[in-house]
């Protein structure tokens, strides 16, 4: 199966990497593509965007980087649509991930799971 995961911070990277290891045990042919970090990258697959390029805490930093936030959102939507995974797994990071969930369910009809 093709799995698309999104973890936008260090704790999500940890949980997603553990999930990836478990999925690989059950599905040795698992193919991963993700927004995440170094722990996920160590599990294999394709890192599309590192979380350190996405994480902005607080209202002012988000506003100051709104163009980057929106660009990351567009990149993520386009990448999911182009890769056509069997499932999308979202790990925490609700401000970003819930918008992606709505897009995927509405436009792509791919199953979405929110993990943690």
Language-model features and meaning:
Residues 2-116:
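Active-site and donor-binding regions of nucleotide-sugar-utilizing enzymes
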């Amino acid at each position: 199966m093709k799995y698309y995961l999104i973890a936008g911070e260090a704790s999500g990277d940890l949980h997603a990497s553990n999930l990836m290891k478990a999925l690989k045990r059950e599905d040795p042919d698992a193919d991963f593509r993700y927004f995440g970090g170094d722990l996920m990258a160590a599990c294999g697959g394709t890192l599309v965007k590192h979380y350190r390029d996405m994480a902005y805490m607080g209202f002012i930093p988000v506003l100051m980087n709104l163009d980057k936030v929106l660009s990351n959102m567009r990149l993520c939507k386009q990448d999911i649509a182009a890769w056509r995974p069997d499932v999308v797994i979202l790990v925490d990071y609700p401000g970003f991930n819930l918008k992606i969930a709505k897009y995927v369910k509405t436009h792509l009809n791919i199953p979405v799971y929110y993990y943690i």
